[in-house]
């Protein structure tokens, strides 16, 4: 973000490439095992007056050394762009046209408990002319949402995703929602994060969508429409625990299980 506007991936690439060509040490690091590629860039830099001029040359359609650009792009993704290492992106800049498939893929969430939609009118601001209008705002009394995702090992090697990146991701996905001040995130809190790490040679997603092993039912004799808080639900994770226990071990599919829980929720294997 710059100010109140989003920075496109192409503009971000442009800024980082320009900073890199201005820094000889960084450029040499990028091409540490590619001396011929480094030579191409240094020859261009020696002839041009500034980084903007270098950028125009290496992104020109007539530039004959596009493979050198891809070497630089691979370095920048692995060293500078943690978001692309996680979720991938497509670059559409001349000389840098390439798509990276993100190792981390998340599905849409759905509610474990039945909900009743409550529609209400809300004021929607039209940003371009400063005016406002009324729109529909759909809410529910309470919903326990579940999300499923995968981390693909081959794609992770392609983008350079590291174990440190994964640690950042786990903390971010756990802490970001309650930290968000937006109206749509109000009163949303994580209860359980569970990640299955497979043994070497076992492809991810072996057990399908793990949400299929979770059941949530109203307790205390109340109906679905009367659910108002987390404590109103009975969460049955027995099938999930059974799945993990039967498949965990050095000679089985599961290597380890990473778990985070809220203070008001207990889950252990």
List the predicted regions and their residue ranges.
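RNA-binding basic/glycine-rich loop and surface signature characteristic of RAMP-family CRISPR effectors
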Residues: 1-269
């Amino acid at each position: 973000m710059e100010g109140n506007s989003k920075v496109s991936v192409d503009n971000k690439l442009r800024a980082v490439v320009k900073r890199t060509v201005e820094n000889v040490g960084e450029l040499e690091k990028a091409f540490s095992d590619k001396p011929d590629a480094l030579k191409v860039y240094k020859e261009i830099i020696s002839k041009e007056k500034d980084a903007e001029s270098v950028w125009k040359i290496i992104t020109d359609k007539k530039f004959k050394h596009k493979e050198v650009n891809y070497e630089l792009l691979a370095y920048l993704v692995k060293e500078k762009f943690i978001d692309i290492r996680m979720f991938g992106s497509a670059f559409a800049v001349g000389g840098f046209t390439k798509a990276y498939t993100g190792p981390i893929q998340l599905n849409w969430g759905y509610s474990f408990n039945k909900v009743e939609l409550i529609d209400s009118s809300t004021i929607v601001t039209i940003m371009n002319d400063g005016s406002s209008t009324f729109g529909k705002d759909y809410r529910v009394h309470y919903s326990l949402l579940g999300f499923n995702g995968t981390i693909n090992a081959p794609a992770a090697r392609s983008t350079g995703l590291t174990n440190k990146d994964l640690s950042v991701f786990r903390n971010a996905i756990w802490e970001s929602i309650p930290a968000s001040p937006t109206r749509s995130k109000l009163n949303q809190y994580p209860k359980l994060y569970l990640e299955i790490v497979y043994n070497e040679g076992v492809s991810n997603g072996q057990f399908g969508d793990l949400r299929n092993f979770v059941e949530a039912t109203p307790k205390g004799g109340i109906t679905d429409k009367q659910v108002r808080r987390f404590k109103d639900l009975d969460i049955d994770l027995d099938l999930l625990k059974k799945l993990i226990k039967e498949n965990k071990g050095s000679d089985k599919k599961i290597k380890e299980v990473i778990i985070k829980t809220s203070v008001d929720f207990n889950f252990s294997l």
